Amino acid sequence: MRLVVVQNGDTLSSIAKKMGVDVEEIAVQNALPSEKVVAGQTLVVPGGRSYVWMPGDTFSGVAERYGLTVETLRSSNKGIANPQPGDILELPSQQKGGVVVAGFLELTTPDQDAKNVKKFAPVSTSIGLFSQGMTSNGQIVPANDASALQAFEQTRSVPAAVFSNWIGEQFSADALRVMLQSDTEQQKYLNTLLDILDRKAYKAVIIDFEMIPGSLHTSFLIFIEQLSGYLQQRNIPLLICMMPITLNDNPNASGLASYDYSALQAYADYLIVMAYNWHWGTGRPGPIAPFMNVASSIEYALSQVPRQQLLLGLIRYAYDWLVPFQTGEVAGVIGVQDAVQIAIRENIPIQFDRRSLTPWFAYQDKKGRIHELWFEDARSLQLKLQLVEYFSLAGIAPWQYEQRFPQFVPMLQDNFQSVNWL
């Protein structure tokens, strides 16, 4: 796939003519409802392969990584003498490596859940069904997962049970504390978890406990050790969601201390680095997954954990903030495609922030309110996929498949093949 950023004056027809493809091919790959496009929009176009220049890149370094000569790389990109981070270059097609693709799917309705499983199973090693939630007293709220589980039949993908401390509106540290600090409640939780595994078709377990206080470090580790023992007896892999820690962070800080990479990796098959939400929907607007933060969180994880155990969390969503930000307000969460459609509808050019290497734009709604949206697009996604390859990580963990991001699957297939656990 080639990446093309729409310029002022471009039309879908002019882009198709320049790239030597049919308009329909571009429209299908990008799920365009019409031929309308907007400046700054990144499109995927069939044929060839693109590379997005990363901070620290040199022609010699990129050429060496991809088995090219500097002359070949330069001749393929004659119009780019001095690339800057975020610039798009062309590469010859390469042999694709295999990675784990541990996607997440937030359950909505039985019919839609089944459709999503069937749609994404062909490109996913596993799909984690979100979620087996939690009551306020720390016990499991079973998921309405029957339709989704049935849809896995005759697919190559593995259904993963996601156990979280989501209590319906937020992740609850208090609910988690009730369970982890009581031997009785913890064993009750584990018994329920194992009963779900024994009764249903799940073949993997994901622990997504978020906002864990540092005071629960030891209790959480004991819980994971016990769970790991039970799962090993059943030959079921364990994945643990981890808050991102950069090289500049204090890993012993209250909000990070319980995410002990070095200790937890001894009991997990994979750790998922949730390398996003540096700007939360409950905070001020800004880039959700800035490139340098993502890279630094990978480097920290690699200082604690073997690379073959690390999965990079990726996002498929946008935050839509009202500005100026007011404490207590919460940004809307929409899919990438929905964000792009707003830009097209409002005819607002999409900006690409060269510092965070992510897209954003602002617009005024019918009520006169100013919105600021930050999100991922095909260009910023390609940068994250290149990091997976650069650091030789085990794979990726996209959040989440219900959100619309039509370029995601073509980009994934262009870079990697998903490995099979079956």
Residue ranges of each PLM-predicted region?
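Glycan-recognition patch characteristic of GH18 chitinases/ENGases
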Residues: 93-188
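Active-site groove signature of glycoside hydrolases
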Residues: 128, 190-219, 270-284
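Substrate-binding surface in catalytic domains of secreted glycosidases
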Residues: 136-140, 217-221, 226-343
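Glycan-binding loop/region signatures in secreted carbohydrate-active enzymes
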Residues: 162-176, 316-384, 414-422
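Short, acidic/polar
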Residues: 107-122, 183-198, 253-262, 376-389
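Conserved, mostly hydrophobic/aromatic
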Residues: 127, 207, 271, 312, ...
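Primarily a LysM-type cell-wall glycan-binding module
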Residues: 1-19, 41-67
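Acidic/aromatic/glycine-rich contiguous surface patches that form carbohydrate-binding/processing clefts
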Residues: 384-422
